[in-house]
Every structure is written in structure tokens, then in C-alpha cells.
Amino acid sequence: MPWIQIKLNATNENAEQIGDMLMEETGALSVTFLDAQDTPVFEPLPGETRLWGDTDILALYDAEADTNFIIDQIKASNMLAENFAYKVEQLEDKDWEREWMENFHPMKFGERLWICPSWREVPEPDAVNVMLDPGLAFGTGTHPTTALCLEWLESMDLSGKTVIDFGCGSGILAIAAIKLGAEKVIGIDIDPQALLASKDNAERNGVADKLEVYLPQNQPEGLIADVVVANILAGPLRELAPIIKGLVKPNGALAMSGVLDTQAEDVASYYRDELHIDPIVEQSEWCRISGRKQG
């Protein structure tokens, strides 16, 4: 059946309250917050829900909803200016799951590595193929930071090497490393759900026997690896620099991403005391910092 969507604009101070009101008082089936100014929000504080200064609110209703009643309820809430602007749209019914699936295609990284959704045919059966379905929380290769790390791993000789994926998320980098020849990969993440996702995706790719996953507090003492990759954010890369450097063997390699071009030189400065840093690689304002630890 078709749906009705009502679009409002709010500030970050009252957007969540308005969203709650739409759900509780007007019968909205779902409420979505969008950035009205295309301004990214990075690195919220622990426990903080960050929204944009200018936020669009999209509320979805079934086709029979009384839009006059909904607008009257919004006015009565006094959460918006008296003459607030709004837009009512009718959305056609679609096979949303199929449309969502059609947006994802196999992606190639470097010369031989493919990330492919399970419902798509593998373009090159003889290439290195990682089967990974898009999820809500963790990387699938579409973000520049993940792509930068995948390209770096693909360029390395990982045969027989031990690799640490620091902040493993979906396990995409860990699984790619195994498929590219790594003997053993250790995934570390602060989120237990990430560890479950990594193990599940490794099972689907037939490489679970080569992947170990740990919360930071449970990782083995003295853990080090030939290759370390950390796709997290600039703040943690700075704060955890001593820990991350300590995971890299002498003459071992490290790659980091999740860093904007304006942050890259500063983040790199935290690692130059122990690593020879390669030229920084940029893609769509995001950067990869890589280097080799001094022997």
C-alpha cells in the first residue's frame, strides 16, 4: 500500500523531542533524522547522541492517516514556530527490500580483491572474493576508509603472516587478509556485537578457523603481528597510539584510516617516533596513514 511522509525542519536541541512526540501523539510508524545542511558529524562523545544544527525530520504514516490531525497535534505541542513549514508527500508502494538489494554491487579493490554481496554473481571466480552482505552498523567496503584499507591489504604480501584488525567491525578487513594469504588474523573491537559479526562473516566465507576475536581487555598478553590495520577514528588513533604501535612487530607494517585530510598530519605525528611513515593517501577527503616499524 502507499504511505504518507511528512517532512519538518528542527534544530538539534528539539529534534529528538519532536521525533518522540510524532511517534507517541500522532501515530507515526517511523521517524528519521536527516542532515538539512549536508554537514557531517564525527566522533560523538560516549553516550552522546549527536544531531546536526539544522535537522530534517521525516515521519512515515499509513495512507489513511489524517494529515490535518497530525499537523494540528504538531502545532499544539508548541515545539516549532507558529508558522512552521512542512511538506506532505505520498510515497508509492515498492518492494523496498529488492530496491535496497539492487543498490549494492560487487566492488573491486586493487588487482584481485572483490567484495561481493551474497545475492550477486561473483564477477571473477578465480579472484580473491569476500562475500559480505551490507549491514546496519559495520563496514562493507562502500566507505572510502574501508576501501583505502582494503587496497592497502591487497597490495601487501600477506602469505604466512599474522595480521591484527584493530577495530574489526564486520570483519571485512580481517576476512580479506585471510583470503589474501594471511596465516592467522586477530580481530579486536570494543563492541561484542562486532566480534559476533566478524565471526559470523568469517564462517560464511569459510575462514573462521583462521580468525580469533577479542575484546581489548581479553586479548592475549604480548600480542604482536607482522601487519596491523586500524580503521577507526582520529581521536582513538591519537589516544591509543602507544597501544597500536606496540602491536606491530619490528619491521612490521601498519595502516590506519578513519582520518580526514585535515587530521592526517597530526595523527601521523603520533607514530613517527617508531615508524617510517609512507606518503599519506587521500580518497574523498579521507586518508590512509601507513608505515613500517623500525627494526
From Swiss-Prot:
Q: Which InterPro entries match?
A: Ribosomal_L11_MeTrfase_PrmA, Ribosomal_PrmA_MeTrfase, SAM-dependent_MTases_sf
Q: Name one GO biological process term.
A: methylation
EC number(s) from the headed UniProt entry: 2.1.1.-
Concerning SUPFAM superfamilies, the annotation shows:
S-adenosyl-L-methionine-dependent methyltransferases (SSF53335)
- Keyword entries, A-Z: Cytoplasm, Methyltransferase, S-adenosyl-L-methionine, Transferase
Positions of S-adenosyl-L-methionine binding: 146, 167, 189, 231
Tell me which GO cellular component terms the UniProt record holds: cytosol
Task: Identify this protein by name.
Answer: Ribosomal protein L11 methyltransferase
Q: Which organism is it from?
A: Vibrio parahaemolyticus serotype O3:K6 (strain RIMD 2210633)
